[in-house]
Amino acid sequence: MGFEELLDKVGGFGPFQLRNVALLALPRVLLPMHFLLPIFLAAVPAHRCALPGVPDNFSNEDAWLEAHLPREPDGRLSACLRFTHPQALPNSTLWGEGQNSGEQPEGEPSTVPCPQGWEYNHSEFSSTIATEWDLVCEQKGLNKAISTFFFAGVLVGAEVYGYLSDRFGRRRLLLVAYVSSLALGLASAASVSYIMFAITRTLTGMALAGFTIIVMPLELEWLDVRHRTVAGVLSSTFWTGGVMLLALIGYLIRDWRWLLLTVTLPCVPGILTLWWVPESARWLLTQGRVEEAHRYLLRCARLNGPPVGEDSLSREALNKVAAAERMVRRPSYLDLFRTPRLRYISLCCMVVWFGVNFSYYGVSLDLSGLGLNVYLTQLVFGAVELPSKLLVYLSVRHAGRRLTMAGTLLGAALAVGLRILVSPEMKSWSTALAVMGKAFSEAAFTTAYLFTSELYPTVLRQTGMGLTALVGRLGGSLAPLAALLDGVWLSLPKLAYGGIALLAACTALLLPETKQAQLPETIQDVERKSAPSSLQEEEMPMKQVQD
């Protein structure tokens, strides 16, 4: 008897599992709030060079600014430069700051970076890290780098938590993730310098990676196979809830320190709920901890209410299951590249996942040039994720996985690319295209999880998902840095996001369709699929899945 059969006997889907999903909802809500926090935390409000005070006998502030600030090619006053000497204006006495009256320099007036710092418009944000440490103009790269540092921490933390959770257990490491996220989040909010904030934010990313790695297995390892997809879709709605909740919290709290505290403190009730979160019985059996597994399985059976025979949960039966679980060899990433067909699938999936993450976070973090304020835009971006999931559900059933994957990525690429052609004055069109880009990128994210899981054989499914998620996190960490390309050409970041999404869409078309296909069980099953003979495919020992 295997663990799946054992789980069927105690109830693979019932009150016990539903309670578990509810208890593990909090980490899924917290993740998007931290992942997308730079939208508010690192926002750059309108700013200009700090200037000397307007003289008492001069009432025209616009003329005062005109005398001190040069204009950009688009006609706006410069946010990063000021004239070395104020320019003379008709019928004014401004000329002469720092020089004798009548001594006007010849040629083009010289400019300098803001020597006295910047003045910020605080109507939308009372305080951000950009206003706190003047991360604008020549220092704007440091502002964008915060997101990259954070995602780099997630990248490293995912590997660390993956190893430690297999060794020390899911529940114990989830406690570590909660406590470390709380401590490092508080430290980030108390940062007194940019360096301190960058370090603590990177470590916070490492801590939060525990949620991404542990929560899903802790849910799925208590669910039977039939209900895992339903639970996965239900859990994904918690992410959408977190995206929308962030918009509300950001609107109510305009100071970055208090905002960071607000999205961090829910870790406290999360720690308390761990008392009711069960450890994975499957993991306990692989570690030979039969008594603990027996206790959790009995608790599951009592709560779900199915009749369980004494023989099913006897120590002898559990010892046999434990022995069978320990005999399963733990695969490595190298196993994904040992055979031609599997290597081909893995390389294609890596490109697709990089494109999905790169475009999703690129679109999500780029709210510039839209007609709505940042809070309403974020709320709309969150709300549009729900119909996106419905779109995926309908499309994968009728058009198939491959076309849905390619189509959603192509839609994201077109929406982002068309924004380049829209003039800055056409705010409504730019906003509509941005919302469409977010909808398609979210749909691509949802499809990627389903499609990838069906491409890999059972023996390597988790390993394959782990590799593609790793590459995806790399794409997510690079997406904020791509925004710096606007220094070369204003539309270059959008071209990068759209171009990578288009490349991923083309790559998705190279993958095999899995709609109404049999899930491969072994590596040999995957390799046989490359053979042209349909007879070989019919003979493959694979199980049928409903589309």
UniProtKB/Swiss-Prot annotation:
Cellular component terms per the entry's GO annotation: apical plasma membrane; basal plasma membrane; basolateral plasma membrane; plasma membrane
Name the UniProt key words of this record, in alphabetical order: Cell membrane, Ion transport, Membrane, Transmembrane, Transmembrane helix, Transport
- Which family does the similarity line name? Belongs to the major facilitator (TC 2.A.1) superfamily. Organic cation transporter (TC 2.A.1.19) family.
Concerning Gene3D superfamilies, the annotation shows: MFS general substrate transporter like domains (1.20.1250.20)
According to the record, the residues making up region (Disordered) are 91-112, 521-547
Pfam family for this entry, one:
Sugar_tr
Q: Which GO terms describe its molecular function?
A: alpha-ketoglutarate transmembrane transporter activity; organic anion transmembrane transporter activity; prostaglandin transmembrane transporter activity; sodium-independent organic anion transmembrane transporter activity; transmembrane transporter activity
Under SUPFAM superfamilies, the record lists:
MFS general substrate transporter
| Major location category of this protein | membrane
Q: Write the lineage as a comma-separated list.
A: Eukaryota, Metazoa, Chordata, Craniata, Vertebrata
Name of the protein described by the UniProt record: Solute carrier family 22 member 7
* Record localization: Basolateral cell membrane; Apical cell membrane; Cell membrane
Function in brief: Functions as a Na(+)-independent bidirectional multispecific transporter. Contributes to the renal and hepatic elimination of endogenous organic compounds from the systemic circulation into the urine and bile, respectively. Capable of transporting a wide range of purine and pyrimidine nucleobases, nucleosides and nucleotides, with cGMP, 2'deoxyguanosine and GMP being the preferred substrates.
Keyword field contains Transmembrane? yes
The way it spans or sits in the membrane comes to: Multi-pass membrane protein
The protein's annotated catalytic reaction(s) are: orotate(out) + L-glutamate(in) = orotate(in) + L-glutamate(out); 3',5'-cyclic GMP(in) = 3',5'-cyclic GMP(out); GMP(in) = GMP(out); 2'-deoxyguanosine(in) = 2'-deoxyguanosine(out)
Any single GO BP term: monoatomic ion transport
Q: Where are the transmembrane segments?
A: 21-41, 145-165, 179-199, 203-223, 233-253, 258-278, 345-365, 367-387, 403-423, 431-451, 465-485, 492-512
Q: Gene of origin?
A: SLC22A7
Enumerate the PROSITE patterns for this protein. MFS (PS50850)
User: InterPro entries, alphabetically?
Assistant: MFS_dom, MFS_sugar_transport-like, MFS_trans_sf, Orgcat_transp/SVOP
What residue spans carry the Polar residues bias annotation? 91-103
The source's superkingdom equals Eukaryota
